[in-house]
């Protein structure tokens, strides 16, 4: 008895659950169907009102025609405008035989695109801040070094100039010292000559005095 009652309870629960779960989509489907029916009914009602009244029918027909015409014209206009801006309109139309000689031709040359524009990289020019001359970008750094005297060659030239200046200053100082020594030697020689002349004068005077004394002491 207990097993039978348990099975009956389980079966009753399952039937209740299935009935409860099956009720929800049925209600949703019914609601959706009701909404669809009401929308279709409203559309049919408005259509009958328009058809029954000839004035409304003309307005509806004109509105439908104008909307279709606007869509078609605007679509074509936008497409042509896009082709014109991108340059594809002439490609679609093509070139006449008479205009083929005067029109642009496709260029098939190295370093040129199909329009004949050079694709090679153009050398960029830079302005030297020291001499304000345009110099190519590849030669800007060595030119700036030479122009401002900061390169290796210019540093060597500057060191040579300094060496020559130092040698010139050293030679001038040595020549001045030599002139000073020669001048000092000439002064000493002049002093020696003057003293020797003075001694000679003194010796000649002494000899004269001695001779006069001897002559005075003689007896005749």
From Swiss-Prot:
The keyword Transcription regulation applies. Pfam families: Sgf11. Induction: By bursicon. A zinc finger (SGF11-type) spans 126-147. Residues 160-177, 204-220 have a biased composition (Low complexity). Disulfide bonds: none annotated. Residues 1-38, 160-220 are annotated as: Disordered. One of its GO terms (biological process) is chromatin organization. Keywords: Activator, Chromatin regulator, Metal-binding, Nucleus, Transcription, Transcription regulation, Zinc, Zinc-finger. One of its GO terms (cellular component) is SAGA complex. Gene3D superfamilies: Classic Zinc Finger. It is found in: Nucleus. It comes from the Eukaryota. GO terms for molecular function: transcription coactivator activity; zinc ion binding. The keyword Nucleus applies. HAMAP family: Sgf11. Belongs to the SGF11 family. Component of some SAGA transcription coactivator-HAT complexes. Within the SAGA complex, participates in a subcomplex of SAGA called the DUB module (deubiquitination module). The long N-terminal helix forms part of the 'assembly lobe' of the SAGA deubiquitination module. Component of the transcription regulatory histone acetylation (HAT) complex SAGA, a multiprotein complex that activates transcription by remodeling chromatin and mediating histone acetylation and deubiquitination. Within the SAGA complex, participates in a subcomplex that specifically deubiquitinates histone H2B. The SAGA complex is recruited to specific gene promoters by activators, where it is required for transcription. This is SAGA-associated factor 11 homolog. It comes from Musca domestica.
């Amino acid at each position: 008895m207990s097993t039978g009652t348990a099975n009956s309870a389980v079966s009753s629960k399952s039937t209740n659950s299935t009935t409860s779960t099956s009720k929800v989509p049925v209600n949703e489907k019914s609601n959706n169907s009701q909404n669809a029916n009401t929308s279709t009914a409203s559309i049919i009602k408005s259509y009958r009102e328009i058809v029954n009244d000839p004035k409304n029918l003309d307005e509806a027909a004109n509105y439908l025609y104008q909307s279709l015409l606007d869509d078609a014209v605007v679509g074509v206009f936008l497409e042509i405008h896009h082709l014109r801006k991108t340059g594809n309109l002439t490609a679609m139309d093509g070139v006449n035989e008479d205009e083929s000689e005067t029109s642009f031709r496709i260029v098939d040359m190295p370093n040129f695109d199909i329009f004949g524009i050079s694709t090679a990289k153009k050398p960029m020019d830079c302005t030297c801040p020291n001499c304000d001359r345009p110099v190519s970008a590849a030669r800007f750094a060595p030119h700036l070094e030479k122009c401002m005297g900061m390169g290796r060659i210019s540093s060597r030239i500057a060191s040579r100039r300094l060496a020559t200046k130092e040698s010139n200053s050293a030679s001038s100082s040595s020549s001045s010292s030599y002139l000073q020594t020669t001048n000092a030697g000439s002064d000493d020689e002049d002093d020696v000559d003057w003293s020797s002349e003075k001694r000679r004068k003194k010796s000649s005077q002494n000899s004269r005095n001695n001779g006069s004394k001897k002559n005075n002491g003689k007896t005749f």
